[in-house]
Amino acid sequence: HSKYSRATSKALSPEGLIDAARIKGIDVIGTGDFTHPKYLNELKEKLIPHPDKSGFFVLKTMKRVADAPVFMLTQEISCVYTDKGKGRRNHILIVLPNFDAVDRLSTALQKIGNLASDGRPILGMSARDLSEHALLADSGALIIPAHIWTPWFSTFGSKSGYDSIVECFHDMALHIAAVETGLSSDPLMNWRVSELDRYAIVSHGDAHSPRKVGREATVYEVASPSYENIRDALKASARLDKTRLPKNYIAYTIEFYPEEGKYHFDGHRACDVSFAPEETKKNNGLCPQCRKPL
C-alpha cells in the first residue's frame, strides 16, 4: 500500500518503501495503489524503468541501481457487488508491466468508481470483470486473489466469498496467476484444497507501514530478474516437478506464524473468546459470552 490507502502510515512513499526493502533484504517490492491519481503522478515523477531489468522500476535519485531494490507496479482493489443473490466483497491484486498499461486500466476503472477516494479503491464490479479489464490493459497482467481466506474480503471468505475459484472468476479463472495465502494461512494449509493445485501460491507483506514490509514474502529463482520471468515463475510453480526444475520458479515463501493471524481462529477479542472450527460448530457459531455471531 501507499500513504493514500486508509489506515496506513504517511511514511509509505516510494522512498520509504525502498528504505524498508533495503533493511529487510527485499529485492523486489510492489508500489501499491497505482490507481490513485496523486500517487500515480508521484510514481511517474520519481520512478524510471530499470536499465537492465525489464518491467522493473527504480528511483530516479538512485545513484547505484545494480544491486538496488526495484519496484513492480501493483494495486489491490476491493470489488463489492452482488452475485447469485449474495453480497460479495473481494480483494484482488493486479500487477502490470508498465505505466501505459496502468493508464489504460485506470481510465477504464475511473468510469466505474472514484479512484481518488482511497489508495485501495472500492469498486462496484465483479472480480471476473476486473480481471477482464486488467487483461485488456495488458495481456501480461498478473491477477492474484488477495489473502484468499479472510472472512469478509476475499475469494474464499466465509462471510462474502465463494466455494471455488471458477465460481468466482468464471472464464477468467484460466488467467489467475496465483493465489495469496494471507497472514492467517500458509501454503501447507492451502495445499489441502485440491482446486488450488493448479495455481501458484504466493505470500506478501500487505504492509500498512514500513516496518510491516516483508513480514511475508515470496522467494523466486529466475534466470534473470524481469517482469516476464516472474510471470513465467508463477506459471511454472502451480505443478512444480522438483526433479526437473524450470529456469524460473518459486523457491519458497516466507510466512507469518499463521496461528497468530487475526483470522486463523474464530472469536471475539472483547470477550476473550478464541475457537477452533470444531468449537465454533459446538457453539452454533455464537459467542458464549455475548451470544453474538463469531
Language-model-detected regions and their locations in the chain:
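Hydrophobic faces of well-ordered beta-strands that scaffold small-molecule active sites
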Residues: 1, 29-31, 71-75, 143-145, ...
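Acidic/histidine-rich helix-loop elements
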Residues: 2-11
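Short secondary-structure boundary/capping segments
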Residues: 10-12, 43-49, 158-163, 195-196, ...
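Divalent metal-dependent hydrolysis catalytic cores, especially in the metallo-beta-lactamase
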Residues: 18-39, 142-144, 178
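C-terminal functional module detector
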Residues: 19, 37, 45-48, 59-63, ...
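Active-site-proximal loop/turn and secondary-structure-junction residues that shape catalytic pockets
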Residues: 35-36, 77-79, 147-150, 183-185, ...
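Extended substrate/RNA-proximal surfaces in nucleic-acid metabolism proteins
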Residues: 40-177
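Internal metal/ion-chelating core segments
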Residues: 162-213
